[in-house]
């Protein structure tokens, strides 16, 4: 009986998963570098890079922080995933998986805690907005962010227009020499659809009027309440976005771990 030769297929690294992970992460890397570059450029324009103490001088949130932090995290993750997949480097791939997994669990924990301690979150959001109201004129990026939020959610202040008493330019004290005294920023104003030119002085002296009179000129609802209402109205969309991000993260972790297993299997046959 003639002898039969058995041929065993040697394990190999899956090219499809490898180059998909590489392509996905190179896009991630480029976007991260772009975010980081925008953040650093903005800081350079504001003189922060030449005076690091300016980072702590601002009473509210500097929106540029968001670009720098998000850009930095995306760049690190993109680099690890991209080079790890291309060079079949198990250390970088494991780093990518662990880092991405850590971010996933932090997001999950944040979501659970936000649901359980929603009253505390509401109080913190109120405090956060009021701190930024105080620093409204201190930074142009912060000013633009607050104006955008108040216009988008048709609100004024954290709980209402009187929160602008916290700002030295808008407070109603007799010692305030500002022309904006007892007023609110233009972003609080109820816009006239027929108005072609934005009236930036529409909020002047408006808080000297009675509350019922104010409603014809400015939005009297607070941004905390309006933000909560927006979340409830768009719950399906918001939940869909977060679920999509979570699934993408899980897919990236599984893809990286599968690639690590393939690389180890190939090395075991050397």
Swiss-Prot record:
Keywords: Cell membrane, Disulfide bond, Glycoprotein, Membrane, Transmembrane, Transmembrane helix
CDD domains: TM4SF9_like_LEL
GO biological process assignments: regulation of membrane protein ectodomain proteolysis
Disulfide-bonded cysteines: 155-223, 156-188, 172-182, 189-202
Cytoplasmic side: 1-19, 85-94, 256-270
One GO cellular component term noted in the UniProt record for this chain: plasma membrane
Transmembrane feature ranges: 20-40, 64-84, 95-115, 235-255
Entry's localization field: Cell membrane
Coiled coil location: none
Glycosylation sites: 51, 171
Pfam families: Tetraspanin (PF00335)
Extracellular topological domain: 41-63, 116-234
Record's keyword annotation contains Chloroplast: no
Record carries keyword Endoplasmic reticulum: no
Topology versus the membrane: Multi-pass membrane protein
Function: Part of TspanC8 subgroup, composed of 6 members that interact with the transmembrane metalloprotease ADAM10. This interaction is required for ADAM10 exit from the endoplasmic reticulum and for enzymatic maturation and trafficking to the cell surface as well as substrate specificity. Different TspanC8/ADAM10 complexes have distinct substrates. Seems to regulate VE-cadherin expression in endothelial cells probably through interaction with ADAM10, promoting leukocyte transmigration.
PANTHER family: TETRASPANIN, TETRASPANIN-17
Oligomeric and partner information: Interacts with ADAM10; the interaction influences ADAM10 substrate specificity, endocytosis and turnover.
Family note: Belongs to the tetraspanin (TM4SF) family.
Protein's name in the database: Tetraspanin-17
């Amino acid at each position: 009986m003639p002898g039969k030769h058995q041929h065993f297929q040697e394990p190999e690294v899956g090219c499809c998963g490898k180059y998909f992970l590489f392509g996905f992460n190179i896009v991630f890397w480029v976007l991260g570098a772009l975010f980081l570059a925008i953040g650093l450029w903005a800081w350079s324009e504001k003189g922060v890079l030449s005076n690091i103490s300016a980072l702590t001088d601002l009473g509210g949130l500097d929106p540029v922080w968001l670009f720098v932090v998000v850009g930095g995290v995306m760049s690190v993750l993109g680099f690890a995933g991209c080079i790890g997949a291309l060079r079949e480097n198990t250390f970088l791939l494991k780093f990518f998986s662990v880092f991405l997994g850590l971010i996933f669990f932090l997001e999950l924990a944040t979501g659970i805690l936000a649901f359980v301690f929603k009253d505390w979150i509401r109080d913190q959001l109120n405090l956060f907005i009021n701190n930024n109201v105080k620093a409204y004129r201190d930074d142009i990026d912060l000013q633009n962010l607050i104006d955008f939020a108040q216009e988008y959610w048709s609100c004024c202040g954290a709980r209402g227009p009187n929160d602008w008493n916290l700002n030295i330019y808008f407070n109603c004290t007799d010692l305030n020499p500002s022309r904006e005294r007892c007023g609110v920023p233009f972003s609080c104003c109820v816009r006239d659809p027929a108005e072609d030119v934005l009236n930036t002085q529409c909020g002047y002296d408006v808080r000297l009027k009675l509350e019922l009179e104010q409603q014809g000129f400015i939005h009297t609802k607070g941004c905390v309440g309006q933000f909560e209402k927006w979340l409830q109205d768009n719950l399906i969309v918001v939940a869909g976005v977060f679920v999509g991000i979570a699934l993408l993260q899980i897919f990236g972790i599984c893809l990286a771990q599968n690639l690590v297993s393939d690389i180890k299997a190939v090395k075991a046959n050397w």
